[in-house]
């Protein structure tokens, strides 16, 4: 017998609520989010020019992403505060598409997952790249921010390849 999907942050009367995770057992959890920042050739050239933008822009975006993951519960109203064990941010430069591909990985051992932390980290990394490159391209596009993988807890492993 299958269960009908529900919105977990709404009660029976449709009012918002924080999900009660007090009864759950701490388990190892991991989530990976991905996204991309696409820009024009000029901005991409400045970003990737040796001794120019790449190091500073991407390092700033990495630090911003880690901070965002740590503060996720302050930004997303019904998100639980949780102890992050790890936040990792990786960038892949895509010259053909003038894009930076972002991968945010978060881990914890807790009662609830780290999907929101990974998604927030990825989003803020993308926004930071946008902020630092917008002078060279007002038309920068942040795209495809999504959960790619999660594991742990009752729902187990999930992939979005």
Curated annotation (Swiss-Prot):
Pathway: Cofactor biosynthesis; molybdopterin biosynthesis. InterPro entries: MoaC (IPR023045), MoaC_bact/euk (IPR047594), MoaC_sf (IPR036522), MoCo_biosynth_MoaA/MoaC (IPR050105), Mopterin_CF_biosynth-C_dom (IPR002820). The keyword Lyase applies. Its EC number is 4.6.1.17. One of its GO terms (molecular function) is cyclic pyranopterin monophosphate synthase activity. It comes from the Bacteria. Substrate binds at residues 78-80, 116-117. It catalyses: (8S)-3',8-cyclo-7,8-dihydroguanosine 5'-triphosphate = cyclic pyranopterin phosphate + diphosphate. Keywords: Lyase, Molybdenum cofactor biosynthesis. Catalyzes the conversion of (8S)-3',8-cyclo-7,8-dihydroguanosine 5'-triphosphate to cyclic pyranopterin monophosphate (cPMP). HAMAP family: MoaC_B. This is Cyclic pyranopterin monophosphate synthase. It comes from Bordetella pertussis (strain Tohama I / ATCC BAA-589 / NCTC 13251). The lineage of its organism: Bacteria, Pseudomonadati, Pseudomonadota, Betaproteobacteria, Burkholderiales. The gene is moaC.
């Amino acid at each position: 017998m299958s269960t009908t999907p529900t919105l977990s942050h709404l009660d029976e009367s449709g009012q918002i609520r924080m999900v009660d995770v007090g009864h759950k057992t701490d388990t190892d959890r991991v989530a990976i989010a991905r996204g991309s920042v696409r820009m024009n050739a000029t901005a991409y050239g400045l970003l990737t020019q040796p001794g120019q933008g790449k190091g500073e822009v991407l390092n700033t975006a990495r630090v911003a992403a880690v901070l965002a993951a740590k503060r996720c519960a302050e930004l997303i109203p019904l998100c639980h505060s949780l102890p992050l064990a790890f936040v990792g941010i990786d960038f892949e430069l895509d010259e053909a598409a003038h894009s930076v591909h972002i991968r945010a990985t978060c881990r914890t051992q807790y009662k609830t997952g780290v999907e929101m932390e990974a998604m927030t980290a990825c989003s803020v990394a993308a926004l930071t790249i946008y902020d630092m490159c917008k002078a060279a391209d007002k038309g920068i596009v942040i795209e495809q921010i999504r959960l790619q993988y999660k594991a742990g807890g009752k729902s187990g492993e999930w992939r979005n390849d």
